Amino acid sequence: MKKISRGFSLIELLIVVAIILIIAAIAIPNLLRSRIAANQASAVGSLRTLNTAEVTYAVTYNTGFSPTLGDLGPPPGTNAPVATAAGLVDEVLSGWAQSQSAATVSAKSGYKFTYSPAATDMTGRVNAYQIYATPISPGTTGTNYYFTDQSGVIRQNSTAIAGSSDSPLAG
């Protein structure tokens, strides 16, 4: 009588595992590059949103630009927007989600956003601001550094923290 063999041999299983590892070695770096590109696109979009929110804040409250990122955030509960909680950006971008207070730093999509009121007059009116977007983990969450100010121009640098002298972002 002949013995019937069922299942896979060890060699067949090793070949399947090797093929899966080769496919993973090709796919994972592409996936990471895609994630970096998505984070960088999100950072640029967030800077555009913050620039628009700052102009809206200045026009709406007639007090210049906001003193903090938190002032651009949503009002607590169902309260109406006020100068300290204008409701122009979400709680993540305003920093409220991280600190539960008026923040000058927030984090979103692998980037840290640092807000700095740059020029204040005698009445306390903020006439200029700077926002820096830096990767939380350079090379992993993003490779470019971004900067914007009250001019609305977004600038980038791929080697160091961006500033007003760096080249503007194309598009």
In which residue ranges do the predicted regions lie?
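N-terminal single-pass transmembrane signal-anchor helix
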Residues: 2-31
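Extracellular/periplasmic head regions of type IV pilus-like filament subunits
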Residues: 52-142, 148-151, 158, 168-171
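Aliphatic-rich helix starts adjacent to a transmembrane/signal segment
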Residues: 4, 30-47
